[in-house]
From Swiss-Prot:
Pfam assignment, any one: Acetate_kinase
Locations listed in the record: Cytoplasm
SUPFAM superfamilies for this protein: Actin-like ATPase domain (SSF53067)
Protein name: Probable butyrate kinase 2
Amino acid sequence: MFKVLVINPGSTSTKVALYEDEKEIVRSDITHDVETLKNYKSVIEQLDLRLEAINKWLSENGIKVLELSAIVVRGGLIKPVQSGTYVVNDIMLEDLRKGVGGEHPSNLGGIIGRALADPYGIPVYTLDPVAVDEMEDVARISGLPELPRKSQSHALNIKACIHRYARENNLKEEELNMIVAHMGGGISVAAIKGGRIVDVNNANQMGPFSPERTGSLPSMKVVEMCYSGKYTLEEMKKKIVGMGGLVAHLGTNDAREVVKRIEAGDKKAKLVFEAMAYQIAKEIGRMAAVLKGDVKTIILTGGLAYSKPLIEIIIDMVGFIAPITLYPGGDEMEALRDGALRVLRGQETPKIYG
């Protein structure tokens, strides 16, 4: 029997779970107060806060790190890699600390995992990190050669959805063309060709705005803001990732609260909420063009897929493209667990980063 601890840092929470083989023993979603997170200038500064919360959770649940077979974490913005399971080695750890691929809560996963595991010599793995890159060359070109488009997405859940759909429908992944829209604190809309993510908006910088990210912005106006003298570099980064989207417009990243406001007659909340759904649907349409209309299904997943009002707007706009499949929430925890178990059972050889 293998004991596996799974750690999945998100924008405003850290999901943790203990498994004995495939059996879930305990699972929690440790929520971090938005106002508290605002006090941190960067994601890396949240390390002690999140590590303390996890240690408290471990203690409350009587979990001893020494008894674990492995820790597996959600991967962060490292250098571009192929899909698969990786050892969180020193090279990856350094790149996560530096944020070589950018700022993202998942950068903390490997750092937290190693902080817990190193005193006991326990292996730490990551699976299908945000930096998974399968984009076609034509999708990388932007209007400036200095600024190529990069593949950064919620690859873990996107890949889990591909695996699940293929399994449930008795289909081969390499024969599947589909669109997967992961909708959470950040939003990734991916074109899947032959099971590969051939194009995707960069959830930190492009595409639809989300509960706390701006998505694509009018570039000239962004330049003007940067040179206005009103904002530092870090303040501008925070505006785009962390303080954008619903947070910027409505002061909350909770779509459920926004829906309550709408039901209470808040017209601004209604307009902003509909705009977010509109932009998600528009991005799905863009990805349908990438696949030349050959779309088996459109999968809507992530926490926002629980929002019936949001889903209704999206389906109304893109239902003509392909049948809609709903996988609300995400299979990220199970996907991470399964990756670690495959390695522990000798079914897969972990890849080495760097």
